[in-house]
Amino acid sequence: MGHAEIETKFGLNSVMKVYTVSDLHVDYPENMDWILSLNSTAYLEDILVLAGDVSNDLEDLIRVFNSLKSKFKAVHFIPGNHELWVEKDKLNSSLEKFEAVSGLCDSLDVELRTVHYEQLSVVPLFSWYDFSFGQPDRHLTLAWRDFRACSWPAHLESCADVNDHFLNLNREQLDISNEVVISYSHFLPRIDVMPSYIPEDRRRIYPVLGSNLLGEQVKQLNPDIHIYGHSHVNQSIELENIRYVNNAFARPTEHQIARKQLHCVLELDS
């Protein structure tokens, strides 16, 4: 699909609220049960921004997408790192997996491109991590599953190359303006969205959380709200006049850092 395409949705002036959640990780049965049991009538006039890491399994993605599409007026998605794992797939690379997930979104009418809802624009920003938040230590290099579960074509020799590839998909989106602009990514656009209370020994994961170059694109777009996932640490913080929001559902054990519910980031006038 053409990732730079922009779609205008007419007749959606009745959209009332924009909700977000990320990192559903529905390979945990209790997480799958939660998403499938969402109220079937409460959100029919609302938009959901689903900021990645639902599942690496395409069948699980289909199940989740079909359920959410029946409950929301529109569902916006962006693949996370888990969606691009290929260790159990018959695909040659994680880029092929990205295209497979993109095609799935297209076939199920899940939005993976910029959409304008009259006074509101919702803009996906693709990315990866590039070690601009720090260099991975030996422990992270050995433990981080992406380094084994993802496979990239030869021309993408480094994580920085992968990040550049995805950032290039965003370039035509960065001059979009509207009364309200919400952008979203899976990865973190700046490391200072992480709370100061994170213990030092947990910060060893920071190199694989996101990219300063993604942050530069967010600043260029200058949205009202930027939604991100990946860190599993819920957050809502304003930095340089942009509200950064994380509402990761996270793993079942991560109750202290995750709300475990949908989060409304915007309510529009009816």
Predicted regions and their residues:
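Beta-strand-turn-beta hairpins that frame and shape the catalytic cleft
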Residues: 11-19, 114-124, 180, 238-243
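Glycine/small-residue-rich loop that forms an oxyanion/phosphate-binding "nest" at active or ligand-binding sites
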Residues: 87-111
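N-terminal active-site segment of His-dependent metallophosphoesterases
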Residues: 2-77, 84-92, 270
